[in-house]
Amino acid sequence: MTADNALYIPPYKADDQDVVVELNTHFGAEAFTAQPTRTGMPVLWVERARLFEILTFLRNVPKPYSMLYDLHGVDERLRTNRRGLPGADFTVFYHLLSIERNSDVMIKVALSESDLSVPTITSIWPNANWYEREVWDMFGIDFPGHPHLSRIMMPPTWEGHPLRKDFPARATELDPYSLTLAKQQLEEEAARFRPEDWGMKRSGANEDYMFLNLGPNHPSAHGAFRIILQLDGEEIVDCVPDIGYHHRGAEKMAERQSWHSFIPYTDRIDYLGGVMNNLPYVLSVEKLAGIKVPEKVDVIRIMMAEFFRITSHLLFLGTYIQDVGAMTPVFFTFTDRQKAYTVIEAITGFRLHPAWYRIGGVAHDLPRGWEKLVKDFVDWLPKRLDEYTKAALQNSILKGRTVGVAAYNTKEALEWGVTGAGLRSTGCDFDLRKARPYSGYENFEFEVPLAANGDAYDRCMVRVEEMRQSIKIIDQCMRNMPEGPYKADHPLTTPPPKERTLQHIETLITHFLQVSWGPVMPANESFQMIEATKGINSYYLTSDGGTMSYRTRIRTPSYPHLQQIPSVIKGSMVADLIAYLGSIDFVMADVDR
């Protein structure tokens, strides 16, 4: 890291600094190599031989790091700006989160290409299972001791590991694809479920089990998603979620797009989240660039993000009630979504995927008359939410299908990496907009809805109350919108203000280069998490000092939420699974990326 870059590195929070002191005291400072980054958290490299005991210590320390927030890898072989870092061909990183401390720490381990293996940590955090499978799938890194190390995103017949730097990034770099009859039969056979591979028995002491495919094309699966159910009659003995059907290689595409041109791709992660997807990405890029946006930009971003929180929750509400048998409410919620999209389209020019946030600002200023459109919606929705609560959510049939169904507690939620409404429905008061305010959320008055039972019904009610709080936030944005520019006055703001290109040739040249070639970001690492529609979403960016990201890690909330399914639904009925799936509120693009 260069000295100039180090000037922008923020100090750790007190709680983050405390864990560094605890680690140094217990293991000795020589056990760690600290990496200065712009992630805002301690990043510590450790030897592979000590990784397991260090992670175990963090899992059991007072005020523990109860959540394995993320685990993934980096191919370091082409990275040029690595001064001061341990030698590595590949890196595996472990991002840990402590709710009690409101603290993060990242542990990294360096690997050589000749010895790509790290001990599994599934005995410490159960949600490491899928993350380790994905790292093996994408990079070919082995995890000895893993219960079932197999492909998870790519088909079982896939050859190669796509996130390696020597793996082609475009279809034109591969041989033409053809599907012969023999190959089709091979693919079909590879998809066959074999219970023995997953430690399941085909029969018990007095019964034969039935194995049922739910999906990958089933309306209650909410996307291309398969769950193989082991059934004893209607009772679910065990199940295996099968994902990856929607995988498009979003993290690989980020390595071939400029920092600016990748923004539209973020919209397609949680495709119901709209600009909510743009926010963690542009905030992370702005950390790399050292950009501080004007106050007006913060308020506009918050207002539009909350609009998309509402549209996403309205879709959830209508389809969830439909999943348990009530057909009418979905038409009402779609009417309300249309009213929201009328406002969104008037402001951004688009509906579902505006790709409207920019590095350093937003695409353009608010249009004339935007206040009336926003006010009309703010006045409209609360009365509709009252109707939904009275007519549908207090319905005895819906309650009978959801109260006490698929319940889990805070401890279980944290162990599986659950965030958002799923975590808060257990009574855990953790909302990033309050706990770690970003983009100026600390300037707004709103409450964090909580529940106590952690069941399917509570998850629904938390989201309904979140819509009420979003309305309060939008109303405050409307009433207190600051004056000022909609883009930061910074050399790396992309694109720079258009009006200046008509007056200054230097600005015109910069505009041309940044749009066509892309802005050059300082070599460093940055990270930003936000409270998205489905839970916590984050972007962890690695810049090698170029116009494109060296590595973009997209951590989505829906991924761990689906991994949790077997632990929650065993012993329940198939009908309970349908109610549970609806209450999770996921989209498969958010899972598969």
Curated annotation (Swiss-Prot):
Residues 208-593 are annotated as: NADH dehydrogenase I subunit D. It is a peripheral membrane protein. Pfam families: Complex1_30kDa, Complex1_49kDa. It is found in: Cell inner membrane. The keyword Cell membrane applies. One of its GO terms (cellular component) is plasma membrane. Residues 1-184 are annotated as: NADH dehydrogenase I subunit C. It catalyses: a quinone + NADH + 5 H(+)(in) = a quinol + NAD(+) + 4 H(+)(out). InterPro entries: NADH_DH_suC, NADH_DH_suCD, NADH_Q_OxRdtase_suD, NADH_quin_OxRdtase_su_C/D-like, NADH_UbQ_OxRdtase_30kDa_su, NADH_UbQ_OxRdtase_49kDa_CS, NDH1_su_D/H, NiFe-Hase_large. Its main location: membrane. Its EC number is 7.1.1.-. The keyword NAD applies. Keywords: Cell inner membrane, Cell membrane, Membrane, Multifunctional enzyme, NAD, Quinone, Translocase, Transport, Ubiquinone. PROSITE patterns: COMPLEX1_49K. NDH-1 shuttles electrons from NADH, via FMN and iron-sulfur (Fe-S) centers, to quinones in the respiratory chain. The immediate electron acceptor for the enzyme in this species is believed to be ubiquinone. Couples the redox reaction to proton translocation (for every two electrons transferred, four hydrogen ions are translocated across the cytoplasmic membrane), and thus conserves the redox energy in a proton gradient. NDH-1 is composed of 13 different subunits. Subunits NuoB, CD, E, F, and G constitute the peripheral sector of the complex. In the N-terminal section; belongs to the complex I 30 kDa subunit family. This is NADH-quinone oxidoreductase subunit C/D.
